[in-house]
Amino acid sequence: MFANVDEAISWITSRTRSAHQASDFRQYVQSLGNPQLKLKCLHVAGTNGKGSTTNYLRSILQKAGYKVGSFTSPHLMTHLDRIRINDENISADYFLKIINEKQQEWESHDLTMFEIDTLISIYYFLDQQVDYAVYEVGLGGRLDPTNIIMPIGAVITNIEMDHMNILGNTIRQIAREKAGIIKDGLTFATFEKKRAAIEVFNMAAKVHKAKMIRTHQARNVKISDHIEFDYQSYHVSLPTIAPYQILNASAAIALLRALKREKKLQISKADILQGLQTSWAVRFEQVSEKPRVIIDGAHNENGIDELCHALAQIPEEKVIVFSALKDKRYRQMLEKLQGQGELIITEFASKRSTTAENLAEGLEGVTVIDDWNEAIDEALRRNKTVIITGSLYFISLVRERFLKQ
């Protein structure tokens, strides 16, 4: 028995590895009676944009008057923000209660943190009687714990080279893992364009008699202090200057329009346009005005490419603070960032992180500061726009620092 939620979180976060297979978790959930099948779910997979797309879907459904659960990772401020209903985290009391009730059972089945989080979200959403639940895939798709759900619709954002040690070394291999969320009769949207990935999606759609919707190109894009664009019959406004959000918003529109046509939900054009007025933390998020500080969770090459595209909208000089996990292609990420402004390389405490010295090896003209707080302090003294990026785990620490100020 845990006395408080901090003890419960400490226990759950210690359960990072397991010897069992994904099929063992599925069998365990079947022994519970498959409670997840009582939920109406949307599923979001892909290399980049999963969190933003999940947030757009949640916000639009919420504007339509629905009670909406969302499951995302990693957390931004507290472990509890992985599981939310509308704009509220799961209650600490419920989280503590269910872990105290189920701890021994979950330990006996050797469940991992992500499997436990998935189960808690299902129990919580059922208890609170949500109308819809939007699930973001943690990693891949086929073997991900969230793949126990039977969604009414899905988005597979894009396919890029990331997590190759787990998902495969080619676009086709990675696409197969992501396409593992495609179920019989599923309607899913994607903005992926690479031929190898689309061939995989087409094959999966044929096998499962699923319907793939490929998003259209946005038209009349204008970027000032926000973004405006036309998508089909919609004139969309987004409260960001990050162009990559156009793709995520378009995927959300495409899926929800299709589900409306299939009479799987009721939603209006106004609901969609108003729902897209939301913003997603750590995605080109400004956390300070003077000096201007922007944090972005780009954590792979494609994410950095999209960040660089967004940085082109900022004319003033920039200083970039960077850290990354050791299993990422950080050298390629840093090479892309070198032309964007002065680089300060740092490190943060994580089992998966690496030293600032390792990150900076072989690079010229960069500043190395081991302590990430000191690195940010140094960047703030430069009297330039400060950009902080490289890892979602790093950015969550940075965000907490600025929100406490």
Where would I find each of the regions flagged by the language model?
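Beta-strand->loop->alpha-helix junctions that form or flank phosphate-binding loops
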Residues: 191-192, 204-223, 239-243, 267-278, ...
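Acidic, Mg2+-coordinating active-site environments of NTP-dependent enzymes
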Residues: 129-136, 153-235, 249-269
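A glycine-rich beta-strand to alpha-helix segment
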Residues: 375-403
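Nucleotide phosphate-binding/pyrophosphate-handling subdomain across enzymes
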Residues: 38, 132-135, 145-155, 159-164, ...
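Short functional linear segments
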Residues: 1-46, 53-66, 71
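C-terminal helical cap/extension that packs against the catalytic core
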Residues: 194-204, 209-213, 224-226, 292-295, ...
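Short Gly/Thr/Asp-enriched flexible loops that form oxyanion-binding sites at enzyme active sites
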Residues: 57, 142-152, 399-402
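ATP-dependent carboxylate-amine ligase catalytic core
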Residues: 29-37, 63-149, 167, 195
